Design a protein with these regions (language model features):
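Gly/Gly-Pro- and Ser/Thr-rich, intrinsically disordered tail segments characteristic of DNA damage-repair
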Residues: 1-163
C-alpha cells in the first residue's frame, strides 16, 4: 500500500510575507492580526489573495474585493503581493521536501504531493514523518503547513482539508 502526503502551506502568500518580514528583523507578525495580501484597487486588481486567520473571523474570503473586505474589517492591514518572494519560499520548501522523498509532484506554488512509501524505516511511521516535515518547515523557513496522509492523492488531499 502506498503512503501519500498532501502538503499545503497555510495562507501561503500571507505566511511567506510574514516570514520574510520577520527574517529581515521586523518584530510584528502579520499572521497575528487581521491582514491580507491584496492587489491594488487603483489598478483594478483589488481582490484578497490570502488572509490571516484573524481576518477569517471577519468572514473575509479569498477572491473577495478589497472594498468589501474593508467594510467588514476597517482595521484590515493590506500588503501588496510580492511574487518573487513567494517563488523563493516555494522553491525552498520543495528543496527541503526533497530530503524526504524524490517522488514529489508540485500541485501549485504552495501545494504538493509527496510519496512517503518506503520511508518509514528512515523517518518513522507516516504521522511521525509528517510531524518532522512540518517542524522542519516551521523551524527553517518560518511558516506552517497542513499535511494530509492517504493511500492516494485524493484521500491525502481530503485528509489535509479536515479540521
Amino acid at each position: 500500500m502506498r503512503t501519500i502526503f498532501h502538503i499545503d502551506v497555510n495562507s501561503a502568500f500571507l505566511s511567506w510575507e510574514a516570514a520574510k518580514r520577520l527574517k529581515s528583523g521586523d518584530s510584528f507578525d502579520l499572521r497575528t492580526v487581521p491582514s491580507a495580501v491584496a492587489g491594488s484597487e487603483k489598478d483594478r486588481h483589488g481582490i484578497i489573495l490570502a488572509k490571516s486567520f484573524p481576518a477569517k473571523k471577519f468572514n473575509i474570503k479569498t477572491g473577495e474585493p478589497v472594498r468589501s473586505a474593508l467594510e467588514k474589517c476597517p482595521e484590515l492591514i493590506l500588503v501588496k503581493p510580492d511574487f518573487g518572494t513567494y517563488r523563493w519560499y516555494s522553491n525552498k520548501m520543495f528543496g527541503l521536501l526533497c530530503d524526504f522523498s524524490d517522488k514529489i509532484e508540485r500541485y501549485s506554488i504552495d501545494e504538493c504531493f509527496l510519496d512517503y512509501t518506503g520511508m518509514e524505516s528512515i523517518y518513522g511511521e507516516a504521522e511521525d514523518g509528517a510531524r518532522l516535515i512540518s517542524q522542519r518547515i516551521k523551524d527553517e523557513l518560518g511558516f506552517t503547513v497542513n499535511i494530509g496522509i492517504g493511500e492516494n492523492k485524493l484521500l491525502a488531499k481530503m485528509a489535509g482539508e479536515l479540521e
